[in-house]
């Protein structure tokens, strides 16, 4: 830089000598340097007198091409499969994915909203309270015991049977196994009841006031005693009845037919 000029504001000192040509050239060079370092709007150095036009054009071209080229290491916007997948398939996949997400969200909401249900308690029935499974067990055992009793009675030929007589105000119960045949049973019943006979002979030769011994078999039919073998009678007899001879008419033929069918 040139040395500062001394100015005579009062007018006492003589005027300064004119600057030489060398000092003027140095001053112009300083002005050029200052102008190059000034702050301006625009590209740096675009107005610098020392910058060549070719360099300016190259810088401008580089600036425009940088915007079009991707950054180093950046990924492509779409994968290679996107170019090969048709738009409809891509749209379908996107819709299915959205629906799956919505369904999953709804299930999660239901799980959160619905509280866990308490365990169901066994039903209490009866008094005192008996739980249902115990009731079922008791019913099963009762049915089983009843079935065993029936089987035992059938196997033993209903050992004890009730004996009734028309006009008698009471019933009796006898054990058929204590008798060996019809005659023994008839003698035993005569001690309990009087005035009856057994078999077809008693039904055919009946008189007023005579009684006939009948029985009820497994099928619920009433038959005359003495029409079937003793063993068959003891196995099928359920009940004995001493009825009047007039009421026993018609039982003998049925008993004979049934005996033939069994044989």
Swiss-Prot record:
Gene Ontology CC: nucleus
Signal peptide bounds: none
Cell location: Nucleus
Main location: nucleus
Transcription recorded as keyword: yes
One biological process term in Gene Ontology: regulation of DNA-templated transcription
Induction of expression: Not induced by auxin.
Region of interest (Disordered), ranges: 1-54, 76-121
Summary of subunit composition and partner proteins: Homodimers and heterodimers.
Family: Belongs to the Aux/IAA family.
Protein name: Auxin-responsive protein IAA3
């Amino acid at each position: 830089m040139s040395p500062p000029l001394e100015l005579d504001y009062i007018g006492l000192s003589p005027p300064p000598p004119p600057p030489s040509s060398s000092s003027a050239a140095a001053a112009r060079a300083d002005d050029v340097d200052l102008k190059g370092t000034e702050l301006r709007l625009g590209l740096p150095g675009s107005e610098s007198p020392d910058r060549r036009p070719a360099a300016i054009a190259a810088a401008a071209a580089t600036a425009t091409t940088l915007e079009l080229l991707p950054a180093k290491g950046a990924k492509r916007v779409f994968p290679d499969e996107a170019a090969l997948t048709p738009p409809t398939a891509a749209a379908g996949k996107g819709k299915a994915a959205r629906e799956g997400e919505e369904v999953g969200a709804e299930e999660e909401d239901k799980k959160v909203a619905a509280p866990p249900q308490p365990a169901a308690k066994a039903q209490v029935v009866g008094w005192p309270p008996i739980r249902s499974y115990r009731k079922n067990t008791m019913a099963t055992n009762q049915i089983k015991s009843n079935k065993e009793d029936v089987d035992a009675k059938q196997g033993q030929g209903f050992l004890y049977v009730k004996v009734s007589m028309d006009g008698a105000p009471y019933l009796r119960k006898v054990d058929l196994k204590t008798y060996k045949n019809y005659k023994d049973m008839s003698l035993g019943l005569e001690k309990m009841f009087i005035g009856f006979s057994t078999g077809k002979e008693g039904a055919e030769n009946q008189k007023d006031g005579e009684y006939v011994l009948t029985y009820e078999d497994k099928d619920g039919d009433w038959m005359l005693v003495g029409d079937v073998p003793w063993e068959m009678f003891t196995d099928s007899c359920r009940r004995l009845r001493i009825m009047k001879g007039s009421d026993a008419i018609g039982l003998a033929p049925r008993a004979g037919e049934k005996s033939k069918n069994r044989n």
